[in-house]
Amino acid sequence: VIPERIADIVKGIARGCEKANTALIGGETAEHPGLLSEDEFDIAGAATGVVDADKQLGSHRVKAGDVIIAMPASGFHANGYSLVRHILATQKLDLHKQYEGFAKSLGEILLTPTEIYTLDCLALIKAQSENIKTFSHITGGGLADNTARVIPDGLIAKYDRTTWALPGEMKFMAEIAKVPQTDMERTWNCGIGMVAIVDPAIADLTIKSLAARGMKAWIAGSIHAQNGPGAAALEGNYLTR
């Protein structure tokens, strides 16, 4: 164990906890010689929250006509790195190189910290608890799979790709490795890290409230009636930069 490295790791975890207004109540450091090399480390963590049963958000609150408010991702976040590593290896990309169109090296881009949306979501709930239906954190599985988990039977969430542009780093990786769009959208967040499903009456207010907090959000779609289990789909073509 290198003390300075452990200190840097804990500082990073503490910064994340501060951004989520979460207490760091403990932890353990274990050495595994023979399993991890001196330059490797593995980190795991968990957070627990409490909510009154009658204040739970979820699919039971979602209705046809509700609006999908998207919050931008800061990058790949913590998902889809198996595909990223595959592309790095097969395309022989240089992590230290600053590729055309980017202000940082590829390695720096891939290490961009994951955006933490906790306080933004809590602020919306506090201000409009009756009209905030639910949230969906876009992690493994992409936009459609994650959103479908909070959509009840008989409804479908439809995203309009024309409302946002695919992040440059994802476009670059997909194009250079010829990744099909369907595979990309099942693996990466494609630029959206969190969505709030809200009553249409507060859609504009929600966007303004998030903007006041420094979060540039937008209307990315809406909820529609359909026959079948709850689902989500993406339509149209991404904006071009």
Predicted regions mapped to residue ranges:
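Membrane-targeting and insertion segments and their boundary/processing signals
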Residues: 58, 91, 95, 143, ...
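Glycine-rich anion-binding loops of enzyme active sites
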Residues: 1-82, 222, 235-237
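Glycine-/charge-enriched secondary-structure boundary and capping motifs
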Residues: 5-20, 36-43, 100-111, 115-241
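Acidic, glycine-rich loop-and-beta core segments that form the ion-binding/anion-interacting portion
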Residues: 62-108
